């Protein structure tokens, strides 16, 4: 019994180390993509930045595209979490909480938002990550459905103007995009531009 427990503990510890190393790879890759641009970053440079061997990167990700799409998924998951928190607050009476959560999550790191948008275009036809891109689109549709349901309830309560729910959602999206553009210009003025 004791050897089974210690064996299970070893397996859990190995999994924990594996996941920590995977996150280290993603963090290194993201920093390089933002600093150097996608095309100038290689799996070797990611490995060097993460302080591991190139072969170790391939134990986690078969291709550079898998690393790129993982960055996209992580970003979208963070937005999904924030929007869900905002929807819950909106349901509890803070009518602007969902829009605020959306704005804050998109504007917290405009350079990352821009990178993810660029990656979506770049990877749109990549067959090796088609399943992951579909997962991304499922998350986005779920976010949109949650927002539309919440907005419909706010319209029904008379809190928001009675127009189709997607008008409100798209207005928030357009404002976030406009704000992101202003933030990008400000970042460019200071000389810290992102090369993609």
Describe each region flagged by the PLM.
Residues 1-36, 40-49, 66-69:
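Basic, helix-initiating cap at the start of DNA-binding domains
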Residues 50-61:
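Short hydrophobic/aromatic patch on the recognition helix
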Residues 70, 84-112, 168-172:
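Hydrophobic alpha-helical connector segments
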Residues 108-131, 181-188:
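Amphipathic alpha-helical segments used for helix-helix packing
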Residues 113, 156-196:
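Hydrophobic/aromatic-rich alpha-helical bundle segments in the mid-to-C-terminal region
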